[in-house]
Amino acid sequence: MIRRRTLLSLVPAVSMAPFAARAQTMEVRFGTSTAGGGFAPYAAALIDALKSVDPILDIKPVITKGATDNAERLQKGDIDIGLVSGEVMYEWLSEHPDKPKLRVISVIYSTPGMFAVRPDTRYHRIRDLLGRSIVWNPRGTGSAVQARYVMQGLGLDMDRDFDPIYPESFADGPTMVIERRAAALWGSGYRWPGFVELTNQPAGARFIVPTRAEITQIRAKFPFLAELTVPGGMYPGQYEPLTTVGAWSYILARPDLDDGIGYRLARSLFRAERSSMPSKHTVQTTARNTLAAVGSLDALQPGVLRFYREAKLVQ
């Protein structure tokens, strides 16, 4: 018996994460989004990544209206975890300071925001789009909320200074630009589906981002928006890097999520991160990025923080 204890004591603590939890199926309700935005392909890739390292972790996707809907459902306890953009998270915490806080499981990816227009138009700057019909995407989605903050940072109102379009589906936006029913489409993220569709058209697309002075102006009003760069070659015909603003998006947990679930999710995400073939959709979903993005360790779900400490990722 003494010898057995000695051998067990040599096994790293992180690999001894609750054996009972590993041996049991655990159901997690996961708020995603409607098709056509960046969350939908990410959610599918995340579920596949988690299944590859923890096959009996039963992630149940729940199709929602997007980031704001996910925040509302998390607060009510209707879902266990959900995808929420950084802009919606900032807004939710600001508007509901007295409610139990939604906690961070992990970052998803950073979301640089910009416009796409047909290349045969005369629009080259944001101010050129004033009064024009703009597809802001479905109301309450991370992209639409981000656009509102960016426009407010420039002293503009997305509803009064533009002719706003809020389609029911993300998929409607590119078609409206292609058919000239809209002058521009706002989107956020790398390889954002709407932009991929536009740039794959024979005519292609041209992107419009804030100028250097406009980026400074936006960040002066909303410091939580970071300066982000879309590398050249991300889309067909886009050869130069594009610098704009955006924020990290998150996997958030309901306030009373069991710490054992948080721990298991963090452990599985860490294993997926260290796998030899991470998905292109989840490559930014790392513990390092999560720790860099959160303002305080208190923002982390307690089970996640416990795993990070056992894995020696934080003190």
Describe each PLM feature range:
Residues 139-150, 225-293:
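Ligand-binding clefts/hinges and TM-proximal coupling segments of bilobed small-molecule sensing domains
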Residues 1, 19-28:
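C-terminal segment of N-terminal export signals and the immediately downstream linker at the start
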Residues 101-109:
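Short beta-strand-centered segments that line the small-molecule binding cleft or hinge
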Residues 27-53, 57, 111-179, 280, ...:
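Bilobed "Venus flytrap"/periplasmic-binding protein-like clamshell domains
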Residues 86-88, 97, 121, 158-257:
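Pocket-lining segment of extracytoplasmic ligand-binding domains
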Residues 6-23:
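N-terminal export signals
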Residues 171-172, 178-180, 189-207, 217-219, ...:
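An extracytoplasmic/periplasmic, membrane-proximal ligand-sensing/linker region
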